[in-house]
From Swiss-Prot:
UniProt function note: Involved in GDP-mannose biosynthesis which serves as the activated sugar nucleotide precursor for mannose residues in cell surface polysaccharides. This enzyme participates in synthesis of the LPS O antigen.
Keywords: GTP-binding, Lipopolysaccharide biosynthesis, Nucleotide-binding, Nucleotidyltransferase, Transferase
Pathway: Nucleotide-sugar biosynthesis; GDP-alpha-D-mannose biosynthesis; GDP-alpha-D-mannose from alpha-D-mannose 1-phosphate (GTP route): step 1/1
Enzyme Commission (EC) number: 2.7.7.13
Gene this chain is encoded by: manC
Similarity remark: Belongs to the mannose-6-phosphate isomerase type 2 family.
Cross-referenced NCBIfam families: GMP_PMI (TIGR01479)
Gene Ontology BP, a term: GDP-mannose biosynthetic process
Protein name: Mannose-1-phosphate guanylyltransferase
Gene Ontology terms for molecular function: GTP binding; mannose-1-phosphate guanylyltransferase (GTP) activity
Amino acid sequence: MITPIIMAGGNGSRLWPLSRTLYPKQFLCLDGSQSMLQTTITRINNLNASDPIVICNEQHRFIVAEQLKELSKSSGDIILEPVGRNTAPAVALAALKCLKKNALLLVLAADHIIKDEETFCKTIQDARKYAEAGKLVTFGIVPTMPETGYGYIRRGQALFSAENDCSLAFRVAEFVEKPNLETAQSYLDSGEYYWNSGMFLFRADRYIEELKIRPDIYKACSLAMESAVTDLDFIRVDEDSFCACPDESIDYAVMEKTNDAVVVPLNAGWSDVGSWSSLWEISDKDSNGNVTKGDVLSHNADNCYLHAETGLVTAVGVKDLIVVQTKDAVLVANTNCVQDVKKIVEKIKLENRHEHITHREVYRPWGKYDSIDFGERYQVKRITVKPGEGISEQQHYHRAEHWIIVAGTAKITIKGEVKILTENESVYIPVGVKHCLENPGKIALELIEVRSGAYLGEDDIVRFSDKYGRN
């Protein structure tokens, strides 16, 4: 049986301001009602595959668990990377976990869009016989334009199956770096090159066998998995061992070295959604070529991407623009300059701002909060707690809190005294007092929190107990 390995790391900074460090693009709903991670998992339902193994950053663990839960998928196989070490070590962790099962690993990125899912699944099935025979299969995207933003794979000798004389796969002749425009055009004209998708299919044992040509990676990952511990839904690998691992991609560490690399062409409407212009290209457009999301009005606007998260966005007499509005930031960019969005993100970092890290609305394992106003000595939040969930037992040294219940029922414990509050009731929590909040009801609990004090940072917290295992 195929075991999907979903690579859910990365921060997608080219899609700022929607994509942030703590809520990157793979968790966003960009092309429908599901997040990109959820769409990636749903896409392989017809493959009769096992539940996926998701590899993600420590900071994203609760987002991944919640999105898997929404799909009714098991969340028991979420491998947490203490640091990012690229794709070769990440896949090694999953392969080591699956080694005894002799699993066939389908390695997928969580942030790709594939329009023709039927063709995608058929191509996976066609490639299966090569992977089962011990080949390391990579999927090459049939190019549609001389793209300079992707690496390429040059195909070599055709491989013919016993069933027919029509080749479905080729030996990999070479992997090539991102070309200039002239070279990319020559690749397109030759018909021998494919875009490097970063998707793979191989047996777990074959990957580990080939990885041993890099004993530094193999040893570090083996030690990391040998000392791994299970925490709630998560597999925490040993931090010291994994941090010692080199940062290396699968292509460099394995695929360029092996004699068994095979490329299977894939023509299924693939996109890695690497920029706002690529998202515009794959999205439905109006008669003027505009893509609109949210509350948007336009007049004499052409070929624009207009996104309104809150409030009204209007565009008049403009063309070839990207306009993305969120609760705390607005991006306006020419479609020809979208690769430079990363430079704006770097400027935000240099100015020690926070807009590249988190949205105004922040998700937690118990629910979410929205910072709706703040000043020098106060902050106002709208807090939503899911049924059956609650915040940790905690105290703060520098701030007091006022909670006003807007909807639902709150079970509040202050200095050991339990109170049940409902709509239009409130409570005051003094500085330094131990307290906790739970939602015992069947509907979401909504409240307004007003903080006041000399220091209002999220790190002013001492947790005494926490059901989510946070420090």
